[in-house]
């Protein structure tokens, strides 16, 4: 037997009854010593590796479908298929299979799997009864035909024999002629029988019968037969829907008649499977496997034919980006691409890779960048869906495009910034589009799917790009909504307007595109008609929660990039302002952000938190929560419990020294007493170490170490104030949206800095950096509805042994009004510290009170 090689694709059927592409190669039939018999071998055309080695078993049932497919099952729930490029190759391999099994190549199935009882009955049949005798195709025989078709469905052998009889006698076309006669005569009984007959023929699961039934000549009559379900009082109107309601739109004329016919056929067959046929029972689920395969291979063929027609795709892209294209036409073009990408999901990874590379080569991403910035909501939605297909399949391709784009475009029109601003400006009250876009951004900035090669690292390059060009756009709503500086708020509002008008100008988009109501200032999430941010607007809170979720992801997965950004922007302080939001879910998002930072157990972050006194808004929120033991209460307790269990010494000392008096009344958990115990144990250990050192060395070393540490920390944390724009951890280029500030803002900042310098000189000196003031609202009175009173807990300053006093500027707290989204903590040096009387805090009510 000659070793004939033919080009094929190898498919396997997965658990979801979908065909998985295992690769393309050349098939041969040859004797394999290890398998002790003739076998089918497929070697990959790319590298010659073995894709398939399958012994031709004498008892295996092979089926030939659609002239170019051979399908068989090797084991339970393991189906294989060979899809041939040429019919001649399929015929030759089919002959080899039939030769090994001793079967007639003219039939399209070698045999079928049967149970023992079926086999016994089959052996008892006379040899002359090879095919089933069909009744004559007449109106008065329809009931008999229906009974025959339904009776064979339980027997694989009889199903096969009936299929052969139907095929050989051209019976289906005769049945469809009877259908037309029954409709003309309004013969309801006959129409009900025809429904059972056609449905039964579909369940025969024969590709050759499908090719007849789904041909242009027959398919609408098949649909007509399936309208007359006896279980329904009135027939359905499926043909009316397919011919009148469902309109086939050629966005670009398709010149290939075979392609057009294939598209029509696939749509109608999919409609039959999804809409007309009832959901198969557990006993029928395998009856339509061939129908699923028929649709699958049709879709593969459609995508391949379109992909190979570069003239067609080039014309689609040209019209999509042409300024002269009207809105309706552009909407159709975008919807076509959306459907095209949806079809591509039937392809396997190798084929999808080629498909998306073709789209990328033709310019899909620049085209998306244009249409995503348009004012048509339907177009933007479809463009977002296409973008999601691209990101899901190849985030690296999208990242590579935006990094190249950054070299020749302004930040405002970068694709990722357009995506971010679409998220920010989502007009949906539930922010459905914003949630989808946030998920795409999360995929793009996820280091887990970034590539690393010997020449370059995608992770470092892309994250540098993202933090330099995009992060300021993402955090703009957060910084705006937590700012007490009117000028800063005005800048961000102006930035929104500028960005959208810039994107929609003719030089960067289409001449007809102008900032519409959907993307104008009036519809920035949470803004009102007076161009002011509504800080506790529910939609604003939802958006800020999404942004915080993304920033929390950055803290977990990025290293020095997000650390630099948090330090330079004092971002955690701004986030903790949201602890005072009336929306608990937003306060929890802010708390989760801080919890992730503390969870890293990074001393840089810990010193930043203690220096900025950033536990204060968290503790204020806990006390303001009163006796309500809800999710917020539990989340705050868990934060402090983590610090206790992990024994984070710097944070433990800070909490106990500064806040223990306010927290000691909380006794329903042992967290705070446990922190105090940890603190005292550590203090005892330090004292023991000091006592073991000679006094003169202890004095010198203590003085030197304390001073050095103090100076280092002051230098490190004030570095950003003294040297504007200098990175704290690593020299990453810092985003500077301030470059676009109006001149009057620059003058304002100069005046503000001058005033700050004066304030620093006029601040009262203290003997030690240890003293500070802690103001909080009494939780019990807040919970009981009474007026909250501010209570000041003065911690006595610690004195060093003979060391000179050092003037430091520590933050002074201000009690926030409940329900307003303002800062719980003033920024350092904003105003002189006011001396307040010392008093002790009231105890927090316990569970039993």
UniProtKB/Swiss-Prot annotation:
Residues 714-724, 827-838 have a biased composition (Acidic residues). One of its GO terms (cellular component) is centrosome. Residues 714-849 are annotated as: Disordered. Residues 776-818 have a biased composition (Polar residues). GO terms for biological process: DNA damage response; gluconeogenesis; positive regulation of gluconeogenesis; regulation of double-strand break repair. Residues 1-100 form the WH1 domain. The modification Phosphoserine is found at residues 117, 695, 840. Residues 733-764 have a biased composition (Basic and acidic residues). InterPro entries: ARM-type_fold (IPR016024), EVH1_PP4R3 (IPR055236), P4R3-like_central_dom (IPR006887), PH-like_dom_sf (IPR011993), PP4R3-like (IPR051137). Belongs to the SMEK family. Regulatory subunit of serine/threonine-protein phosphatase 4 (PP4). May regulate the activity of PPP4C at centrosomal microtubule organizing centers. This is Serine/threonine-protein phosphatase 4 regulatory subunit 3B. It comes from Homo sapiens (Human). The gene is PPP4R3B.
């Amino acid at each position: 037997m000659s070793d004939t090689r033919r080009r094929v694709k190898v498919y396997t059927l997965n658990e979801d009854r979908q065909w998985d592409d295992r690769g393309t190669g050349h098939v041969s039939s040859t004797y394999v010593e290890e398998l002790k018999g003739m076998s089918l071998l497929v070697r990959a055309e790319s590298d010659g590796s073995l894709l398939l080695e399958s012994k031709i078993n004498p008892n295996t049932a092979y089926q030939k479908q659609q002239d170019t497919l051979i399908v068989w099952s090797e084991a339970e729930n393991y189906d294989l298929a060979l899809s041939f490029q040429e019919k001649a190759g399929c015929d030759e391999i089919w002959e080899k299979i039939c030769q090994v099994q001793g079967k007639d190549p003219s039939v399209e199935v070698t045999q079928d799997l049967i149970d023992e009882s079926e086999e016994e009955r089959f052996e008892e049949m006379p040899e002359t009864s090879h095919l089933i005798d069909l009744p004559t195709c007449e109106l008065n025989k329809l009931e008999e035909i229906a009974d025959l078709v339904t009776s064979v469905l339980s027997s694989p052998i009889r199903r096969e024999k009936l299929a052969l009889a139907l095929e050989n006698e051209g019976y289906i076309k005769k049945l469809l002629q009877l259908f037309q006669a029954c409709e003309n005569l309004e013969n309801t009984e006959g129409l009900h029988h025809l429904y059972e007959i056609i449905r039964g023929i579909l369940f025969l699961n024969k590709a050759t019968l499908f090719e007849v039934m789904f041909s242009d000549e027959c398919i609408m009559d098949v649909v007509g037969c399936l309208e007359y379900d006896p279980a329904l009082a009135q027939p359905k109107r499926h043909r009316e829907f397919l011919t009148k309601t469902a309109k086939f739109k050629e966005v670009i004329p398709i010149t290939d008649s075979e392609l057009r016919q294939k598209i029509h056929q696939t749509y109608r067959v999919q409609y039959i499977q999804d809409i007309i046929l009832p959901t198969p029972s557990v006993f029928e689920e395998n009856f339509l496997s061939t129908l699923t395969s028929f649709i699958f291979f049709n879709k593969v063929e459609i995508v391949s034919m379109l992909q190979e027609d570069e003239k067609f795709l080039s014309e689609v892209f040209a019209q999509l980006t042409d300024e002269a294209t009207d809105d309706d036409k552009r909407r159709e073009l975008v919807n076509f691409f959306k459907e095209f990408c949806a079809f591509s999901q039937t392809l396997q990874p190798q084929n999808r890779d080629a498909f998306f590379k073709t789209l990328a080569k033709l310019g899909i991403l620049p085209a998306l960048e244009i249409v995503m910035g348009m004012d048509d909501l339907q177009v933007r939605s479809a463009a977002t869906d296409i973008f999601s297909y691209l990101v899901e399949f190849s985030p690296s391709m999208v990242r590579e495009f935006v990094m190249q784009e950054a070299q020749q475009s302004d930040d405002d029109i970068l694709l990722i910034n357009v995506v971010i601003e679409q998220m920010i400006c989502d007009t949906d009250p539930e922010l459905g589009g914003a949630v989808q876009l946030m998920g795409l951004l999360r995929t793009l900035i996820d280091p887990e799917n970034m590539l690393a090669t010997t020449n370059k690292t995608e992770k470092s390059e892309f994250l540098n790009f993202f933090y330099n060009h995009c992060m300021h756009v993402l955090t703009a709503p957060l910084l705006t909504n937590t700012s007490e500086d009117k000028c800063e708020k005005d800048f961000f509002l102006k930035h929104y307007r500028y960005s959208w008008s810039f994107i929609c100008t003719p030089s960067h988009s289409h001449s007809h595109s102008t900032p519409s109501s959907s993307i104008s200032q009036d519809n920035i999430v949470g803004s009102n008609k007076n161009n002011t941010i509504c800080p506790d607007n529910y939609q604003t809170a939802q958006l800020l929660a999404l942004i915080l979720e993304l920033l929390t992801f950055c803290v977990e997965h990025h290293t020095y990039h997000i650390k630099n950004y948090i330090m330079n922007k004092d971002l955690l302080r701004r986030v903790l302002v949201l602890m005072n939001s009336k929306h608990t879910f937003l306060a929890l998002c802010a708390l989760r952000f801080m919890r992730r930072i503390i969870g890293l157990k990074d001393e840089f972050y810990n010193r930043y938190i203690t220096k900025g006194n950033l536990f204060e808004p968290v503790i204020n929120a806990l006390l303001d929560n009163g006796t309500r033991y809800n999710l917020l209460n539990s989340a705050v307790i868990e934060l402090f419990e983590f610090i206790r269990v992990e024994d984070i010494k710097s944070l433990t000392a800070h909490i106990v020294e500064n806040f223990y008096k306010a927290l000691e009344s909380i006794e329903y958990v042992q967290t705070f007493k446990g922190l105090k115990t940890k603190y005292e144990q550590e203090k005892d250990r330090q004292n023991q170490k000091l006592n073991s050192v000679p006094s003169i060395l202890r004095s010198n070393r203590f003085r030197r170490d304390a001073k050095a540490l103090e100076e280092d920390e002051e230098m490190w944390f004030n570095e950003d104030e003294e040297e504007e724009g200098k990175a704290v951890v690593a020299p990453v280029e810092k985003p500077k949206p301030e470059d676009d500030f109006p001149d009057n803002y620059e003058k304002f900042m100069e005046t503000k800095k001058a005033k700050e310098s004066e304030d620093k000189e006029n601040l009262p000196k203290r003997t030690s950096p240890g003293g500070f003031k802690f103001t909080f609202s009494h939780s019990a009175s807040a919970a009981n509805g009474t007026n909250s009173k501010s209570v000041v807990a003065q911690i006595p300053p610690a004195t060093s042994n003979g060391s000179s006093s050092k003037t430091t500027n520590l933050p002074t707290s201000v009690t926030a009004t409940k329900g307003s989204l303002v800062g719980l903590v003033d920024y350092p040096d904003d105003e002189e510290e006011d001396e307040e009387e010392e008093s002790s805090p009231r105890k927090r009510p316990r569970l039993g009170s």
